[in-house]
Curated annotation (Swiss-Prot):
Compartments it resides in: Cytoplasm
Source species taxonomy: Bacteria, Bacillati, Bacillota, Bacilli, Lactobacillales
InterPro entries xref list: GHMP_kinase_C_dom (IPR013750), GHMP_kinase_C_sf (IPR036554), GHMP_kinase_N_dom (IPR006204), GHMP_knse_ATP-bd_CS (IPR006203), Homoserine_kinase (IPR000870), Ribosomal_Su5_D2-typ_SF (IPR020568), Ribsml_uS5_D2-typ_fold_subgr (IPR014721)
Reactions this protein catalyses: L-homoserine + ATP = O-phospho-L-homoserine + ADP + H(+)
Name of this chain's protein: Homoserine kinase
Length: 287
């Protein structure tokens, strides 16, 4: 059995901790033979191979008596780059327990469990449901709506340095003035409605008008301002900081992507670039 989980791009502009989309880059978990103890094969530096691995740890939270297996993980998703690497591991662990322990979890169950473990829903829900999702939590209940896929390329510029989520969060202010918070919320509300109506002309301006996190984090990711400037020259839809960074995501019409990449390289932006699409496919199984 193989479990596939898509990467996610969250915190889309003003959609801080609530708006994210699945993209066409995957973690693949191959469930192999039973064993005396859990062992996770992978080639990722700094990630454990035993039952403390986040995938296994998550599965055991749901089903403590699971029979140990040998697992093999292959992932296209770079670690600590704002593309949901920890969320994909959590979702893979939930699905592993769901399949091996026959838990028969609903999508709502999976979303609630994953968001509780991760701490916020904007990465895990698109990884489970696929597509673009906006979500919030009231008391102990999560509410979400699925939005139409953005029909452009997602061009991920992935700097050659990690940006720890905790460090990125520490760059944020503890409080926002009431006036600032209401203005930032109005931008998010209008953006969400524009995306739902596929009014990309309006959404284009709003997604780059974040006041929640990008103004405070852009000093940690200097590439954001540089790439956004070049993207404007190529009439891209929008450029934003993906997740907590360090990936900078640009959504752009496919016909403009090649020239945009060439301009990035010409400007000396030489790190990894991935040309992706929004993915309608959430976590899925091959047996």
């Amino acid at each position: 059995m193989k479990i596939f989980v898509p990467a996610t791009s969250a915190n889309m502009g003003p959609g801080f901790d609530c708006l994210g989309t699945a993209v066409s880059m995957f973690l693949e978990l191959d469930v192999l033979e039973t064993s005396d103890k859990w062992f996770v094969e992978h080639d990722m530096s700094g990630i454990s191979h035993d039952e403390s691995n986040l995938i296994v740890k998550t599965a055991l939270e749901l089903a403590p008596k699971l029979t140990p297996h040998r697992l093999s993980v292959k992932s296209q998703i770079p670690l600590s780059r704002g593309l949901g690497s920890s969320s994909t591991a959590i979702v893979a662990g939930i699905e592993l327990a769901n399949q091996l322990a026959n838990l028969n979890l609903s999508q709502q169950d999976k979303c609630k469990i994953a968001a509780k473990i991760e701490g916020h829903p904007d990465n895990v829900m698109p990884a489970i449901l696929g597509g673009m999702v906006v979500a919030s939590k009231i008391e102990d209940q999560y509410y979400f709506q699925e939005l139409p896929l953005i029909p452009f390329d997602f061009l991920a510029y992935i700097p050659n340095y990690e940006l720890d989520t905790k460090a990125s969060r520490n760059a944020l202010p503890e409080k926002l003035p009431f006036k600032n918070a209401t203005h930032a919320s109005s931008i998010l509300g209008t953006l969400t409605a524009s995306l739902a109506l596929q009014d990309y002309g309006t959404a284009k301006r709003l997604i780059e008008a974040d006041e929640f996190h990008e103004p405070y984090r852009q000093k940690l990711v200097p590439e954001l301002v540089k790439i956004r400037k070049i993207a404007h020259q190529h009439e891209a839809f929008a450029t934003y900081l993906s997740g907590a960074g360090s990936t900078v995501m640009t959504t752009i019409e496919h016909s403009r992507t090649e020239e945009f990449i060439a301009s990035l390289r010409k400007a000396g932006l030489d790190d990894r670039i991935e040309q992706l699409k929004a993915s309608s496919q959430g976590v899925f199984i091959e047996k």
